Amino acid sequence: MLGLLVALLALGLAVFALLDVWYLVRLPCAVLRARLLQPRVRDLLAEQRFPGRVLPSDLDLLLHMNNARYLREADFARVAHLTRCGVLGALRELRAHTVLAASCARHRRSLRLLEPFEVRTRLLGWDDRAFYLEARFVSLRDGFVCALLRFRQHLLGTSPERVVQHLCQRRVEPPELPADLQHWISYNEASSQLLRMESGLSDVTKDQ
């Protein structure tokens, strides 16, 4: 009996050591919460809010929220956002899927232990290959935007225009992208072209 308990304990420790268990638990929970417990959001451009709090496991050596945690929390918020507005469901019906192709983060103020915050996510627009989303980390203590993240959500197997048309049952013109986002898109394109040249690949070879 003792041997079995030791084996189970060792197995549990190995699972936690080799897998990001809490990520694998929280991500489906975020999807289920968005799908079953929250109302559908019909406006694709509406801002959605995802609550959070800085836990001891989120801290770095300076007792601030670790920079990597911002991307992680934004991941949960973005999946919940795409679930509530129907984009993930539409992709499933169209037999397509999406991958994160690019991201950038601007940190304005640290989030500290036990500080409550919201991740406010909104769709900024789209082009012929990807959706562009923004996530703001807002402290609930004073409303300060502590971090601003941008994401390029690339679609495989379909186009953003077709997904939006599938959801709205009509053709919808994409909103004009903010100037700073357009600069970021240009940077990504220039970076892709430079990397293709360094690798000896032709312009026909596309990345995400």
From Swiss-Prot:
Source organism phylogeny: Eukaryota, Metazoa, Chordata, Craniata, Vertebrata
Entry similarity comment: Belongs to the THEM6 family.
Any one Gene Ontology cellular component term annotated for this protein: extracellular region
Keywords noted in UniProt: Phosphoprotein, Secreted, Signal
Record gene name: THEM6
Cellular location(s): Secreted
Signal peptide: 1-17
Primary residence: secreted
Species whose genome carries this gene: Homo sapiens (Human)
Gene3D superfamilies hit by this protein: Hotdog Thioesterase
Database matches in Pfam families: 4HBT_2
Protein name in UniProt: Protein THEM6
Residues where Phosphoserine is found: 199
